Amino acid sequence: MYPYILFVLLFVLNACGNVPPDSYTAPRSPEVVARGAHLVKGLAACGFCHGVSSAPTSPLAGGRQVYDLYGAVESPNITPSKSGIGLFSDQQIEQSIRGIWKDAADKRSPTIHRGHEWLSSSDALAINAYLRSLTPINHVVKERRIGFASRNSTGLFSAAATVTGHVADTNPHDKIPYGKYLVNHVARCGSCHTTEASVFSSERYLAGGKIIRVNTQQYVAPPLVGTAQTMNTWSEPAIIEFFKAGKRPDGMQVKSEACPVTFYRQASDEEVTAMMLYLRSLS
């Protein structure tokens, strides 16, 4: 009798735990939408690629040329129109934020959202809620195809993790861990500033050297750690000044087309302080 009851219980629990992935509906409360807006216009800097122009207030209709592992590509429309994300389920939007594409494995780099794979579930759902709240813009963006040879010979050392389960929040009151979360998974500083692995060397965290292409210009991402002049050695006010004003200690203004400093200015004082404390904790 008891084995039979146990079997039934396991069957019911398994059935309840395997709800069709597209069936859940993300929260849409004003508080959740506001959190999403804060992230999209701030540290997550979605408009840096998806905006009609690279500005926090620009419509997110895509179409601007950006670069990934395979070269030039037009950024997708992420407004809730049929030509954007309007036909996506909530789960598909969350997965796209994490770099798991709905049906476009042959169109985009698997690392274009690298870092966001560990975005907390609540933050991913907040971004989803905000994007859903936007005015739909019907703007069809040309899709790119990547050939078999390129897909299987490019970026062999740049694979991103695939995260499909729940990702817990990081407590904002734990300043250094929260700063680490913001640096790595919201602002994704490593997507530009981490040295990529190669046949002869392993990846080096925030060590710089990556070529950033913007239109006809090229920039080399500087290291954030590793020398006596890198950001982790700056004073607390200097790091805060960088995030709030886009200015380095030497007075040089950071180019907003190469780094999303105009988005970083929207970050809260608490977020900037946490990031500063984390960066200063690095040796």
Describe these PLM feature segments.
Residues G36, L43-S53, I127, G179-L182, ...:
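The canonical Cys-X-X-Cys-His
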Residues P20-K41, T154-N184:
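Electrostatic cytochrome c docking/interface patches
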Residues F148, V163-N171, Y181, S191-S201:
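Extended amphipathic alpha-helical interaction segments
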Residues M1-V8:
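Sec-dependent signal peptide recognition
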